[in-house]
Each structure stands twice: as structure tokens, then as C-alpha cells.
């Protein structure tokens, strides 16, 4: 699969690095996508498209004491024949191809490693994602309102924080996650209570 990657050191102090890439991507339907009963679709096409991304990362710290690192990335993908499972009126789900999807957004990551004492270590990681995934295909019918809408079950925003406190062989882990609302219908309809999954924490 053709791909091009480039890194450039902006500053040795703080290890600031700019990164960029472009790639052509393919994904074939899985056996479940094709033959699962009921609902498999043997007529599915493979996904294919082009992805671009660029970003910057840094890392600072003091050996044996602490380190702090972070990264910000922008990405932009154009995918044809995106495979998505959708409910049917027959009571089961089936996969179908969406002619064109534009997925883009920003991802932020940061992490801290700190050793305050020989037997103690604290690690913390956090990330935030803004990931619109828009159906840009052709309408299936004249009344199709799914074009220009967010894909089903994909949250536009998500975030998580993980903390780990280690003392010798003991470890305490805490994880917090957030997901924004997700639509359950391809036209993002809010007419019924089951038209979306409300934002939630866990």
C-alpha cells in the first residue's frame, strides 16, 4: 500500500518534532461482513481511499525523575465504499457500502511519568478526539436525508484520562472516558428517543 512519511526536528530542546504522512488505504470485508447469518452481505465492496495527517510532538523531562510528552495531530481521510452495519426492518442488522465518507478531525494526547521516590511511580495519560465522519455519497432515494450527516454510532467527540499509581508490586489504576452523543439513524433524526445514544461517562 503506497505511503509517504516525513519527520522534521523543529527543536532539539524539548524534542519538538513535526510529522506528516499521506497514504492510500484498503480494507476488505471481513468474513462476518460477508457471511454472518442473518445479515451478511456477500455483495460488499472493499473500502479504499486516501488519508493525510500532520502534527507536532514534544517530550521533556529529567532522567530518573519525570518525563512529560504530548502530541497534536490533524487528519483528513476520503474513503469510498465505507462499510457500516445498519438495522433493517426485518429485525436484524446488515452491512452496506456508503459511496463516499469524509472523515477528519484532531487528536490531542499528553502523558506524564513521575517517580517521586524509589518505590513509587505515577503515570497519567490523557487524550481528546474530534472526529466528524460525514456521509458524502449519493442519495439512495430522492427522500434520502443521510447525505451530509454524521455516520451512525460514531461519536464526534471523545476523551479519556488514565492514571496509574505504583508502589513496588502494587498498582492502582483509574480510567475515565467520555463519549458525545451518537446517532442511531443515518439521517441523524431526533424525532424518537431511540434516534440517538446520549453522551455518557464511564
Model-found features: residue ranges?
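Signature of Gram-negative outer-membrane beta-barrel scaffolds
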Residues: 1-14, 28
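Flexible, solvent-exposed coil segments and beta strand-coil junctions
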Residues: 29-39, 84-92, 137-144, 181-188
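Membrane-embedded beta-barrel scaffold of Gram-negative outer-membrane proteins
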Residues: 9-11, 19-21, 27, 47-113, ...
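Extracellular loop and loop/strand-boundary signature of outer-membrane beta-barrel proteins
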Residues: 1, 36-44, 91-98, 143-150, ...
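A generic beta-sheet turn/junction motif
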Residues: 12, 24, 165-169
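Hydrophobic, lipid-facing positions within transmembrane beta-strands of outer-membrane proteins
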Residues: 2-4, 18, 40-42, 50-54, ...
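Transmembrane beta-strand segments that form the barrel wall of outer-membrane beta-barrel proteins
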Residues: 1, 22, 37, 131, ...
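Gram-negative outer-membrane beta-barrel transporters
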Residues: 67-78, 96-186
